[in-house]
């Protein structure tokens, strides 16, 4: 019987839909939803607890309280289903209809919807072309608005006060109509003829020239056209009927003690109904206008509060002075419907517990406590018990399980076999934060986790908790097993490195076992095989680190690949190795040579080893190998018995002398400062430099002492060998600690920074072993506290960055195999400061070649365009010395609404070409966001110890070759015969014999060149030197100095050093100059020749002018003779703050938000010749004359540093004024490729500084999403408006349609949007609304009558469909294909029938299913 009853309760099949449309509801629509009008404010009768009739919980309107039972109890049971009781008027049906049925309130006077009024920009204002202020005055009964001016000189939509109105009425009588309140506004809205307005606006747009007007008209046109298209009437923005939410969604719950807990909405609705009823009565009584007006205003306010409390005026508050939660508050923000309930659901069949280490598990297993498993797998156990006949009913089975009879445990074992569970550790920052494992039942209450997966989960065992989830359906189990099993996820999706790398004790054990010692016990013995070595070791005849000769059997790939031949064949060779390494060779997988183990295994080496194993031996062998490495590591670490004590921290003997020398040097600088040879700033810079160098020196001495130890070799001579000091071994192996930390233990702590980032010039000379005195301890607390405060901030910021990144990329999925484009970007090795920071091989690995890769010597094609470049390919390319390869990239992919596999390349987490359906957008966002917490908020390192690199003051060549200067390098020779650089962007290249570039160095302005163009040099030769602490201003011409505008007290100040009494002239800041006149002048030097005439720039009429920047110390006197290349002034560089202006996270966020930097550098808009025009006040005028002879002017603030000189030819997009680059300019002037290179390099710089590896393609994916909108320049015959921003795919589709119809397509400019902006401007309103600014997004979407095609992942999660990625993409594709074939079959049948009966067949319309 129970089963029968359930039949009636079953939910009817959910309708299938492909899109969701949002719009404004007309009053009739609202009435059609409603099941009755709510007339009374009463809720329930508090004596009988029954709902009041016609009240907010009325059973007649909303449905019965109990299933199949009317209110008065006349009809009960199923047999009366659908009957409406004549006594109480309640329909007999399920009680759950109270969640679906709506009511309505007929408003006595229309009311404006606050969202369309107050959500900026005000939509009502746009449609009516009135200001928000005016509309508000009309709505809240402070002013009249003219509706129909008739024959009077008044204008429609004119605002007039009450006084005005009465005067006009006396003057014109009833010739004109003016109203106040929502009725007036509704009249105005009704009187708008949309078609006519759209026509006028379009013509106005074509004819007007003013920017402001174009913007205004375009906005208004967009809204009106949306009304036109969607068929929504503007007057629906004014409500006549108010819908009432179903009562179960705003429940009223009786608490014990006769009180009630209620949803705030009920209070808000009660207020509306009360005021509405009072207004009805007043209108019936024909009350005085002023009373009615006041009541109408109060009604308007009540409805405002219901819809969005606090949006206008004071928020309505409940009894406890707390603002009531309105409908808008229900859906927005972190606790709102979208983020709390739709995107973050709690799930059944899950549990959480503390994790402990499980070293005995296999990689794909986890230990699950028995009691947890019993609870999680309950339904499966019930089923099994029934099937086996242990229990007859589910109830009996339940009892069995509760009593935990022995049979239950046996069945549990059976149930969980082959049934994976998913483990998740919060925060889940990337894909590897959830992995599937096969459960192994264990006693106790903690989950056991395999040590090697800790790195992926970022878990440790200091009390971390993890959650377990059970995949229920067969499909879910299959996906968990094939896609999520831990042993299938051995690579990080961020960079393709192995994620199952050993750490800590495992590393220490392996390192200890593979070290070699001189003169160990049994050194020089020879063994016939590994088993002999093991026997000797077990009998203590040899030590682990002794050098011995062993015959080792390796399994190598078989050359003979014929049918039936074994894949691997044994190969025996004699190796000189150590006992430990020989023993480890037992676990080598077939296919790996012994040479990979024949070295001390540090952490990096082990990682490389596992990587090699993965590439050569495949996934299964690697997983087994990693497991065995782990077992060996733990065993060996235990046997090694490494521990540390105070005496292990050796304080270097030279420390005293090094520190003493430094103190002497500092004293010397103090003396120079006192006698006025250096400025205070220079002194500070130098002192800080000395101490950081000292800190380094002590550290170095300490490491040298720690890292080697004396030892007697076999011949009895003393030599040194690498130390077996425990602390040193821990750091050297990479198990724990770093050189910097050891330096603080046994060297000196060094310089500390104040909270503002400036460095305290007195260092802490003590270390932790000697102990700090009170003052030193006090100084060091600064840095330590700041570190803690930073960490807390950092986590939140990093999480927010990840959220924005995921939001902008969530709809990017691989949807096809190849888009067929031949575009790509040229990849080169990344060189910085002459060093190769990232080799070409790392940048192109796993990419698809965009054009053929050609051997430079033989010109034959090595790899064709479209080939995936794997490890062997990049090794070939590197070996042949090819220095540039064009590869496909996500940025140039031509797939619409997605990406193609070829443009993306290798899926780094799997090591093969990416599959169709992979959600590469989300993976990119996770890869960039996950290491976010490791980035700094500013640059802050070890315990606040200031780690400022001593500033570079020279460059030297790293390799042999020939010096070449770039075209922009210019220099002059001064009187001493030195070559002084006067170009700002010159670079020196070192090329090898074939002319290939080996390294490249920037040579700064004012440097002295030591090698000239064409010089052949050896590695280590200095190319140029310069003073790192000041920046000079140098003259390119000789002559007599003549100062202009150098007036003491006006533009320059005499700085007399308090200590030394010497004076220098310093240029003072414009803002600090007194008179207005002085603000516009710029102190400068002109040069006079022997005749007293101004020296001119050769070939022009311009006199030489050399301007001084603010802060420059002028080093020449008026009338002094100067030679070419002499220094006129020096600008001290900024005081040494800790490196990096905006470093770390804020910098990454700044780049992805595409913010224009303040004081950005200026790029040349065109290619042409530079000249300087007439200066205006405070600005200098720079003119570029392009090739056609047109002039382009730039006004540049005087204090800016101009990088070009008169007569120089610049290319479009070249930097002409120094400063940080503006990404928008780069995109506009240099194109997408340059922009992508800029953003990728800048983001990578930040991560590289922290030693985080992220593949470039992830950043490119984000950049693609930032470029996904374009701005229409000329709309052609399309439906777009010039200046409108539209989705790129949308515009390309429209253009294709135009070309197909022989019409004019639109032209467009690329625009760059920051990630927040891009997320909000996505076509999917559901996704945008769930991100930020919910109200604004929904308001706009409703007016536009937007349709969401559910393309992204987020929208689909929210509406509860399978996401269109991974297996879900296949599902949707199959469903669409089936619908298509069904439709065709249906059409065919219809056509046949029509043919039989001879009726003309109507064309079948495509059924779209927008769910309203």
Curated annotation (Swiss-Prot):
InterPro entries reported in the protein's UniProt record: DNA-dir_RpoC_beta_prime (IPR045867), DNA-dir_RpoC_beta_prime_bact (IPR012754), RNA_pol_asu (IPR000722), RNA_pol_N (IPR006592), RNA_pol_Rpb1_1 (IPR007080), RNA_pol_Rpb1_3 (IPR007066), RNA_pol_Rpb1_3_sf (IPR042102), RNA_pol_Rpb1_4 (IPR007083)
Residues the record lists as binding Mg(2+): 460, 462, 464
Keywords: DNA-directed RNA polymerase, Magnesium, Metal-binding, Nucleotidyltransferase, Transcription, Transferase, Zinc
EC number: 2.7.7.6
Description of how the protein assembles with itself and partners: The RNAP catalytic core consists of 2 alpha, 1 beta, 1 beta' and 1 omega subunit. When a sigma factor is associated with the core the holoenzyme is formed, which can initiate transcription.
Family, similarity comment: Belongs to the RNA polymerase beta' chain family.
Protein function: DNA-dependent RNA polymerase catalyzes the transcription of DNA into RNA using the four ribonucleoside triphosphates as substrates.
Record protein name field: DNA-directed RNA polymerase subunit beta'
Organism: Burkholderia pseudomallei (strain K96243)
Gene for this chain: rpoC
